[in-house]
A protein has these predicted regions:
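A residue-level signal for conserved active-site and pocket-lining positions in enzyme catalytic cores
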Residues: 78, 288, 337
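Charged/polar positions within long, soluble alpha-helices
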Residues: 4, 83, 169-172, 176, ...
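C-terminal subdomains that position terminal phosphate/3'-OH groups for nucleotidyl transfer/ligation
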Residues: 197-328, 340, 358
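C-terminal structured interaction module
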Residues: 308-309, 332-359
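Surface-exposed helix-capping loop/turn segments at secondary-structure junctions
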Residues: 5-13, 297-304, 355
Length: 359
C-alpha cells in the first residue's frame, strides 16, 4: 500500500518497484533490536551506571567519547554491529544498503550535543563516535536532512519501523501478560477489542469460547488495524515527514493513539513492574556490572595479577582491534557483552565470579 502510493506519487516506476520499500522496512525491522545487551533496557541502564561509577576509566576521553559510554545506547550498538562487528575484517560489516542502515537509525544523532534538540528522533542517539564517519556517509548517501552538527532528521521509512515496533511489542506484551498472570483475560480482551475496532471484532468474538483463542483473535485483529492505520497516517503526512517538520510517532496523531496509551499504561504498571520482571532486572544489574568489573579491568586497568587473568580471557584479536585507545577498548568490551544472551551472560558471570567452576 505505502510502496505503491510512493511510486505513483513520485513517478518512480519502472526503476523502483513498490516492494522495494517494504523490503527496506522489513530488513530494518528485523535488525532493530540487534544491539540490545542482555536483559534489554535493564542491561543498558546497568552499563551506563557502571561507567558513571568508574570515572577513572573515562579520564582522557573527549566529550563525545565520554557521552557514548555514560549514555550507552543499544541503538548505537546496533549500528556498530551491522556496519562492523558482523564481519570485522570487511569494511561495511553485514554489507547492508545505506537505505536499510538509515531506516534502521531511529535516532540519527551523536551522543553529545552542544544544544539540545527537540522531537521524538532526538530522544536518544544512534551511533558511537567510533562510527561517526560511517554514519555521516550513510546520511549523505541517502540524503538525510542535516539538523545540527552530528545530527539529522529521520529517514522517512524509519517512522514505519517505529510503528511496527510499537504495534508488536505493545500488543504481544498484553498477550504475554495474560500467560504470566499479570493481566486478566477480561482486561486483555477489553484493551485489545478497543484496538481491534470494536463492533466488527466483537461480533466474531461471540463465536469463540476458548479464552486463549479469543486473545489470539483479538491480537491478530489489533495488529491488522494498526498496520492499516500506520500506513494511512504515513501517507497523509508524507510531505511533512519528507521535509523534517513531522517528528512524532505515527500513532501520536492517530485516533488509535489513546487506545495504545491505555495498553502502554497497563503494560508499565502490571507487566514491566511485576515482581518476576523486577527480579530479572535486578539480576541483570549484578551480572552486567560483574562482567564489566572484570573485563574492563583486564582491558584497561593496571597490570595486576588479577587483571592479567581477565585480560587473558579477552578475544585473541582484542589488542589488534582496539589498539591503545581506552575508549575503543571499552567499546570492545561492550561489544562482547552486548553479543551475549541473557542465559549466556548469567552462565559466564557464575563461572568467572567463582560461583561455579567450569567443567
Amino acid at each position: 500500500m505505502v510502496g505503491r502510493a510512493i511510486v505513483d506519487r513520485h513517478g518512480l516506476a519502472p526503476e523502483v518497484h513498490p516492494s522495494d520499500f517494504g523490503a527496506v522496512v522489513a530488513a530494518a525491522c528485523l535488525a532493530h533490536d540487534i544491539g540490545n545487551p542482555p536483559f534489554g533496557h535493564a542491561g543498558e541502564d546497568a552499563m551506563r551506571a557502571w561507567f558513571a561509577s568508574h570515572s577513572a576509566y573515562l579520564a582522557g576521553l573527549d566529550p563525545d567519547q565520554r557521552a557514548d559510554l555514560l549514555n550507552y545506547e543499544g541503538n548505537a550498538q546496533g549500528f556498530r554491529i551491522l556496519t562492523h562487528l558482523q564481519n570485522p575484517t570487511n569494511p561495511g560489516g553485514l554489507q547492508l544498503t545505506c537505505a536499510v542502515l538509515a531506516t534502521f537509525a531511529k535516532y540519527p544523532r551523536r551522543s553529545h550535543l552542544v544544544e539540545p534538540l527537540s522531537g521524538k528522533s532526538a530522544r536518544k542517539f544512534g551511533y558511537f563516535q567510533a562510527e561517526a564517519g560511517l554514519f555521516a556517509e550513510v546520511a549523505e548517501t541517502v540524503g538525510l536532512i542535516p539538523r545540527a552538527a552530528g545530527a539529522w532528521f529521520r529517514h522517512p521509512l524509519t517512522f514505519l519501523v517505529e510503528a511496527a515496533d510499537d504495534t508488536c511489542y505493545l500488543v504481544v506484551d498484553i498477550e504475554d501478560g495474560v500467560q504470566q498472570g499479570c493481566v486478566s483475560p477480561e482486561q486483555a480482551e477489553e484493551l485489545l477489542l478497543d484496538l481491534a475496532g470494536g463492533i466488527e471484532a466483537a461480533s466474531r468474538l461471540k463465536h469463540l469460547e476458548d479464552p486463549k483463542r479469543r486473545i489470539e483473535y483479538l491480537r491478530a485483529r489489533a495488529i491488522g488495524r494498526l498496520v492499516d492505520e500506520a500506513a494511512r497516517i504515513f501517507l497523509e503526512n508524507e510531505a511533512a515527514i519528507l521535509d523534517g517538520s513531522f517528528d512524532h510517532a505515527l500513532f501520536d496523531v492517530s485516533p488509535v493513539g489513546e487506545s495504545l496509551q491505555k495498553v502502554r499504561k497497563v503494560a508499565e504498571e502490571q507487566i514491566y513492574n511485576a515482581r518476576q520482571v523486577m527480579e530479572v532486572m535486578a539480576a541483570g544489574y549484578e551480572v552486567i556490572s560483574g562482567l564489566l568489573d572484570g573485563y574492563v579491568d583486564g582491558a584497561c586497568g593496571p597490570q595486576t595479577a588479577r587483571n592479567r587473568v581477565w585480560a587473558n580471557l579477552l578475544p585473541a584479536d582484542f589488542d589488534q582491534m582496539a589498539g591503545e585507545s581506552n575508549y575503543l577498548r571499552m567499546l570492545q568490551v561492550a561489544d562482547m557483552i552486548a553479543g551475549m544472551t541473557d542465559s549466556y551472560a548469567v552462565s559466564a558471570y557464575r563461572r568467572l565470579k567463582g560461583i561455579e567452576l567450569p567443567g
